[in-house]
Amino acid sequence: MARFLKLLGTYFYYITLMVKSQCLSLLGRYGIIIDMRFSQTFIKTLREAPKDEIAKNGALLTRAGYIHKELAGVYDYLPLGLRVLEKIKAIIREELNKIGGQEVMLTALQNPELWEKTGRFSDQQVDIWFKTEVTGGGELGLAPTHEEPITNLMKTYISSYKDLPVSVYQIQTKFRNEKRAKSGILRGREFIMKDMYSFHATEEDLNRYYSEVEKAYARIYERLGLTDTYETFASGGIFSKYSHEYPTLLPVGEDTVYYNADKSLVFNKEVYNDEVLAEFGAKKSDFSEDTAAEVGNIFKLKFKYSEPLGLQFSDAENRLQTVYMGCYGIGVSRVMGVIAEKFADDKGLVWPEEVAPFKYYLVGIGAEGSKKAEELYAGNEDVVFFDDRDVRPGEKFADSELMGMPVRIVVSDKTLAEDAAEVTFRKTGESKLVKLSELAID
């Protein structure tokens, strides 16, 4: 009987290991890395940033092992950086799904014939294309945006007023041959963007949905920790009188914004003039000037693309009408760079909890401290980055500050003498001893 129970226990032990392995595999497949021991990663931190990386966000993210620079404006995302990106994407997805957004993935390879219908394949009109010759003849471009392709796609699926409204979005890599690509991941030649497009039967319905997106964007930036991101009046170009941008106040930003005392009115430089201010009952003496980095924008496109590309629907009286459109963008990789740049201090990165790759940075010191740290790590792999390297404690502490995870937990022979762990908060630097019985890792 004893032998049987022992065999049964061994069986369940291996079943548990198999289930855990499968769970890790599934989670890893979707880009969520949950078993992260420093000793088992290829990540290495750097004391100094590469000489050609002058932007603070790029320098810190490189030093901390989040990204790797290939060339100007082109970066690889390493495991920790990818995890930050996935958390940003998850927040965006959740809020857009709430307002009826449906996720798609369009090809990056673009047919010139489609773009020539709007005049936007010409280098004189759009000078940021990456273009290439196709084997066998012809030309292709790498998409800098997707207004034309999504409009053309919807011609297959929108034919009646009953098919409207509809909203689709994607989160994918864009390519722009930028002349200035020297701001880390704030401005790249290859970058990750969320672009959403909505389609409507009437202008009233476009306005209704536009308002829903405004509210969703406010929730997104709040959750990302970018609480001083303000909806800003900008030029609507040929689409409408105004569009809206979402700049985050940032000393190294490329934009200039003007805001009143309670920031209920914010204008970009392009529309900041007496005529516009008079429309809002304001005057220049009410406003302050600051620099900012744009992390999103929204436009009422109306018929800008649906008309030349022939996107129409039959209304209730069976008359052909042109579809109204809106477009809504968020620079996902730029958001990551802005967060890195904005919250960093002289020791390194400081991630808001919602986007941090891991909430906790765990350190074990000494034989007993390391053993206890292993126990704390077990079962908490999804929220804990475990620095189990055989290096000096000071090196671990410096790397924890450089990498910027919100909470550091240190278990040492010394803290165990008090049956406690030392908990340090990255944002404030506050440290305290917490009894192990009261230490909640969640």
Report each predicted region and the residues it spans:
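Intrinsically disordered, low-complexity segments enriched in serine/proline and basic residues
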Residues: 2, 20-23, 30
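Short hydrophobic targeting helices and cationic amphipathic motifs
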Residues: 5, 12-13, 24
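Residue-identity detector for glycine
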Residues: 9, 28-31
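Short terminal hydrophobic/aromatic SLiMs and anchors at protein ends
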Residues: 14-15, 31
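NTP/phosphate- and nucleic-acid-binding module
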Residues: 30-442
